[in-house]
From Swiss-Prot:
Part of a membrane-bound complex that couples electron transfer with translocation of ions across the membrane. Required to maintain the reduced state of SoxR. Its main location: membrane. GO terms for biological process: electron transport chain; transmembrane transport. It is a multi-pass membrane protein. The keyword Flavoprotein applies. GO terms for cellular component: plasma membrane. It comes from Escherichia coli O1:K1 / APEC. Its EC number is 7.-.-.-. The modification FMN phosphoryl threonine is found at T187. The chain crosses the membrane at residues 20-40, 42-62, 89-109, 123-143, 214-234, 242-262, 267-287, 301-321, 322-342. Keywords: Cell inner membrane, Cell membrane, Electron transport, Flavoprotein, FMN, Membrane, Phosphoprotein, Translocase, Transmembrane, Transmembrane helix, Transport. It is found in: Cell inner membrane. The complex is composed of six subunits: RsxA, RsxB, RsxC, RsxD, RsxE and RsxG. This is Ion-translocating oxidoreductase complex subunit D. The gene is rsxD.
Amino acid sequence: MVFRIASSPYTHNQRQTSRIMLLVLLAAVPGIAAQLWFFGWGTLVQILLASVSALLAEALVLKLRKQSVAATLKDNSALLTGLLLAVSIPPLAPWWMVVLGTVFAVIIAKQLYGGLGQNPFNPAMIGYVVLLISFPVQMTSWLPPHEIAVNIPGFIDAIQVIFSGHTTSGGDMNTLRLGIDGISQATPLDTFKTSVRAGHSVEEIMQYPIYSGILAGAGWQWVNLAWLAGGVWLLWQKAIRWHVPLSFLVTLALCATLGWLFSPDTLAAPQIHLLSGATMLGAFFILTDPVTASTTNRGRLIFGALAGLLVWMIRSFGGYPDGVAFAVLLANITVPLIDYYTRPRVYGHRKG
């Protein structure tokens, strides 16, 4: 009689990678819809550009490596990378920026390390950081949400601006960014940081139109709540685990609350941190990447808490208004160390 010896793992999750990626893509629909509503059709154009670029870049590398193109593209990981990058950049950023960022993310940050499962850093965030450092002006040129905007460009105008820099009527990006108070608007986090450095009081800052929302910044609060809804659905579907999002949000809220209580004249209130920028997108869709996050439950709690602390520190004291991308990459660096010290004890073995 011949006994077959199989290597671990001996228990398996029946869900394939492609299905999990598809669930994440579906969960992103509420967040995408909210961004389309508040910032216009540019987001959809960026998603289409990023998706096509990601698939072509991945196919090219797979062809060069003589690997199966069709089988790998079916895992949907390239599409997810493109999507996450596209929703992270301003909706009217030039077309070549999203193409450049996506190609860099797929080829350099993912395939250069061996493909899905081998990359130590989140590819979408690598692409985002490369663009942010290289083109800071374009990467911070967000439109004001439609609640306070003079006008939001339609689909044709969005395409025109993305590909040529001008609308059909001759308006440019600066014209579109002109807010109701006659000044160029930015995100709530960017506005807060810039205004504090200019010597304005928090009381004055919170009177700006960008903070006319019920809980936080106009438009941005609903965008974050939409991403939160998608994240809760992912938890319900058991596509992600709760450890990273919970520890991230609790740590960010705790740090923001303590900072605000000790320095209310210079630091943003907790609701600004939780419902502005890429907070919920990062908590449920970026930090939960199974490849670049910690693999143990205790490790996931530490990983999420570290990212939350880093986001608050970068937003409060760093040079960039939103620190999610940098926090994710810095936390990715610590994953091997976290996993080493949180690995479970082998059954039957005692600690030495």
